[in-house]
Structure formats: C-alpha cells, structure tokens
Amino acid sequence: MKFKIGESVAVKSGVTDPDFGFDISGWQGRVQEVDSTDTVFIRWDSLTLNQMGLDLAIRCEEENFDWEVMTLAITEVEKASIRDTEDDVDRVASFMKAKMIEMGK
C-alpha cells in the first residue's frame, strides 16, 4: 500500500517500538516520507505525543532518539482519520520540550 505525504496513519495491532520493544499499537501520526525500501517516516500526532508522555520522551532524548518521529515498515501501518492539526502537534511538542528543559533534561 502506498501512502501520501501528510496522510494520517495508525500503527497496526501488535507492532512494537523497534528501539525499546513495547507495544505501539494504535499510535497515530502523519506520513513525512516514504522511501524505496518500503519504510514510512511518521511524525506523531498530538494525541500520540500526549499518550507517549514525558518519561518516554526523556528516555528517547537520553538514548539520542527523536521522540517526535519514527520509521516503520509500510506493512506496520494503515490509513487513519486525522485527529488533530499540525499546530496541535507543534504546541504539544513545544510544551514537552519546555518541561524537559525545566527538569534539566
């Protein structure tokens, strides 16, 4: 299945985070890029960022991972309805970054 840039996708049931191994079923975001190796680069939506929480974002920062985005196989995601706006994503991400700075992370 091909996805378009900006299209909303959801992670399929049973998919785990490739770095930490926990379940990310249902996480949603927007397609930023699709490459020729059948992987899709996703920027998480604001609801997923809120669900992820500050603790995981901090853990990602400590491991030098970008917590706002993830690359998954095309077979691991499916089309979904858009749940927010890009402004919502920017607002939540900025809030989380500010909290990390406050905490000295």
What are these regions (language model features)?
Residues 3-76, 80-90, 102-105:
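Basic/aromatic-rich interaction segments and small domains that mediate binding to polyanionic partners
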